[in-house]
Amino acid sequence: MATYRAKLPRGSHQPCHTVFIGHNPSLETWSSGHFFANPSNRFWSLLERAGIVHDANARLDDVLVQSHGYGFCDVIEQPGNNANDITPGQLKENTPLFLNRIENYAHGMNGTLKRLCFVGKRQWKHLFEPPLQRCDHGLQPQDKRPLAWPDLLREVEVWIMPSPSGRAVLSKAERLATYIDLADSFEHEVEEERT
């Protein structure tokens, strides 16, 4: 059995610019050690269709971590295939632990972290007290952060990605649109670095 843990670029790996943040690991992720491993989860196909990854090997999170500068973690590290089995109380109790973890990750990245992409709305909304009633997919306003948001992350973009779970009720076009917007932001960033 593989070991479940956050996957972040380290040492000789490509510097980390983006961390994808799930709600909690599926049972498949917990046992395999690979993120978004549930067969009904569309995460990898969404990245491919949006043009964020371009080769078949990039479907493996290990390859993305080592060669592409992506990281992966979950807000709450409790396995299960139904996010609703994790109560609002558990999410609230976990919030300071998660914020401390993500701040520590950012410290280790030495300023290379550009964006946090929450894969699904629920885990973002429950970082607020009281939890947000609603939020839109896409890039979040810079002034809309949880009260205990670490200062180190103040300039880091926050994106809310549509859930790739088979349980989420969205059309294919709705689900894909924000991933395309994210891919466009990567392209824009590369163009800015060239000029």
Question: What would you call each of these model-derived segments?
Answer:
Residues 3-12, 56-66, 101-106:
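Short amphipathic alpha-helices and their capping/turn segments at secondary-structure boundaries
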Residues 67-134:
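Internal catalytic-core helix/loop-beta-alpha segment
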Residues 17-23:
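Short, hydrophobic/glycine-enriched beta-strand segments
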Residues 28-92:
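Short, surface-exposed acidic-centric catalytic microdomains
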Residues 29-32, 126-129, 170:
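Short glycine-/acidic-enriched loop or helix-start segments at secondary-structure transitions
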Residues 1-15, 38-39, 83-97, 129-195:
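C-terminal capping/extension of enzyme domains
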